[in-house]
Amino acid sequence: MSSPTSLEEDGDIKLKTRFQGQVVVLYARPPLILDDFFALLKDACKQHKKQDITVKWIDEDGDPISIDSQMELDEAVRCLNSSQEAELNIHVFVGKPELPGLPCQGEDKTVYRRGARRWKKIYLYNGHRFQAKRLNRRIQCFICHDYIWGIGRQGFRCVDCRLCVHKKCHRHVRTHCGQALQGPNIIPMAPASGSLKGARSNTSSSTTRSGGGIDNGAFHEHEIESPGSTSHDASRAMNGNGSSKWAVSLNDFRLLTVIGRGSYAKVVQAEHVSTRQIYAIKIIKKEMFNEDEDIDWVQTEKSVFEAASNYPFLVGLHSCFQTESRLFFVIEFVPGGDLMFHMQQQRKLPEEHARFYSGEIILALHFLHSRGIIYRDLKLDNVLIDAEGHIKLTDYGMCKENIKDGDLTSTFCGTPNYIAPEILRGDEYGFSVDWWALGVLMFEMMAGRSPFDIVGMQNSEENTEDYLFQIILERQIRIPRSLSVRASGILKGFLNKDPTERLGCKLDINEGLRDMKEHQFFRGFIDWEALEQKAVAPPYHPAVESDRDLTHFDHQFTDELPQLSPDNPDVIARIDQSEFDGFEYVNPLQMSREDSV
């Protein structure tokens, strides 16, 4: 078996190894040889080479299977390849069971249940023990020299030598942990296209050693200037011990009224105490995160908020903070309500209104796609209308990140009425699902109903969703005769059940964008450059008297007081607070504005 430090990534087997409350992630080149495999695991778990261990892998049914022979190891790898899983999940226990069939010390059936325990994850590579870290300042990645900065735990830091790299770069570290880090010891990689130019930094290839760790220029947490800010602004972002002078807490806000509620969160209108600026705060209870995968959508939402914050048709982020029991996203307050509320008042919209809204939505979706993000939750409720009448997409918890040209994903998700046929078929999919959802939304705007109405169904509620999915997959969509030829044409284009033939779904997303812009529904009616600059007058201007006006929000929410229920100490005690390390975030551009007030 090749060393796990091999730099060749294609064909490596990812071993996700659970041992005594930790997850150690390592990589090995096939073929796996039993003795080498056990030696690798003992080293990763810091066990003596003569120590007996028991190794079990988890099959696709979630059952633990022992690995005691080369044949059993080969079978585990064969099953991994046939199931096309991304990793081999392994549990390691010290010693052997007293008798065959008996559990090992520390083994009980709950250890195999997903989400039953919290595991501290370590990525082992070249002797480095990397952990995901939310870095509070911009730090240069030792490999690609781009800056590790943003929302979420996108940075990896070695717990021993404190080497900092992007997650995507950690397998390109050539030097072993503890060795002097010099330029020749690093695999050359092209700097990322998003590198910040002219950042204040004295980083170089030289290194010095301080104490037991590595003191490299790339690891000094230099503040660098944000676009449009001054050096002074940037340098005051953090104080000497790394805590933020701009720290935000619940005490900074006065909660006014509830403006929305979903499956996972409540949204409250709030006033910033010192600036009197109005925001919306999305509040999520930590107790709902009882599965390891549940936390992922929060990290995704933060990451997409960061990408969206300066784009005109996407809701931006002010800050994030937490208490022992809750997470808080402070976001833009958009006073015109959402398209769902607007449609309830209007029943259906003129084609020119639908053309304007769908044009701005196309620009917003293309912006996300150009950054490798599938939105996956386009619906009337998630399209907000600002005070001038322009739209903003919101709610990024369903997004899928890191989609490059030709990449596909397979997660079954979305709002039932908007789910694309390829998702329902279990096919892998890409950006195509967003253009299908836009077709559904445009149909709703212009026809005043869903293209998949199942009103009058005799089935029980349990079967209604299955029947809806059957309709989406099989039934031909009937376009109302009242719609123009142009409108009918674009609906047929977006609602094509074959994603390879669907409007906007070219491998080159810019080519797909051109196809949409040049469709007869838009051609000659929209100046796309002016639209992106918000220089096209909206067809509807919501009557908003002030930033506190709630006229365009449903009274079932606004009549509710924004009270937070008292914390239950027993519930708090069961929450693993380390899962939320680094959740705090402050948009430096927002805080600079507040400082100037």
From Swiss-Prot:
Alphabetical list of InterPro entries matching this protein: AGC-kinase_C, Atypical_PKC, C1-like_sf, DAG/PE-bd, Kinase-like_dom_sf, PB1-like, PB1_aPKC, PB1_dom
Keywords of the record: ATP-binding, Cytoplasm, Cytoskeleton, Developmental protein, Differentiation, Fertilization, Gastrulation, Gonadal differentiation, Kinase, Magnesium, Metal-binding, Nucleotide-binding, Phosphoprotein, Serine/threonine-protein kinase, Transferase, Zinc, Zinc-finger
EC number: 2.7.11.13
Zinc finger (Phorbol-ester/DAG-type): 127-177
GO term, biological process aspect, one: antifungal innate immune response
Domain AGC-kinase C-terminal: 524-595
Catalytic activity: L-seryl-[protein] + ATP = O-phospho-L-seryl-[protein] + ADP + H(+); L-threonyl-[protein] + ATP = O-phospho-L-threonyl-[protein] + ADP + H(+)
Cofactor names: Mg(2+)
A Pfam family matched in the record: C1_1
Active site: D377
Subcellular location: Cytoplasm; Cytoplasm, Cytoskeleton
Major enzyme class: transferase
Superkingdom of the organism of origin: Eukaryota
Signal peptide: none
Family in the record: Belongs to the protein kinase superfamily. AGC Ser/Thr protein kinase family. PKC subfamily.
UniProt-listed SUPFAM superfamilies: CAD & PB1 domains, Cysteine-rich domain, Protein kinase-like (PK-like)
Quaternary context: Interaction with par-3 required for the peripheral localization of par-6 and to form a par-3/par-6/pkc-3 complex, which is activated when cdc-42 interacts with par-6. Binds avidly to the phosphotyrosine interaction domain (PID) of a novel pkc-3 adapter protein num-1, which enables tethering and targeting of pkc-3 to the cell periphery.
Skewed-composition ranges (Low complexity): 200-209
One MF annotation (Gene Ontology) recorded for this entry: zinc ion binding
Keyword rRNA processing: no
Protein name according to UniProt: Protein kinase C-like 3
Main function: Required for the normal progression of embryogenesis and viability of the organism. Plays an indispensable role in establishing embryonic polarity and in recruiting and maintaining par-6 to the periphery, through interaction with par-3. Required for epithelial cell polarity in the distal spermatheca. Phosphorylates serine residues of num-1. Required for the expression of antimicrobial peptide nlp-29 in response in response to fungal infection or physical injury.
Tissue expression from the record: Abundantly expressed in the anterior and posterior pharyngeal bulbs, the pharyngeal-intestinal valve, vulval cells, and a region at the posterior end of the intestine that corresponds to site of co-assembly of the intestinal-rectal valve and anal sphincter, and depressor muscles. Modest expression apparent in four hypodermal cells that provide cuticle and muscle anchorage in the tail. Strong expression observed in discrete patches and spots in vulval cells and in somatic cells of the spermatheca.
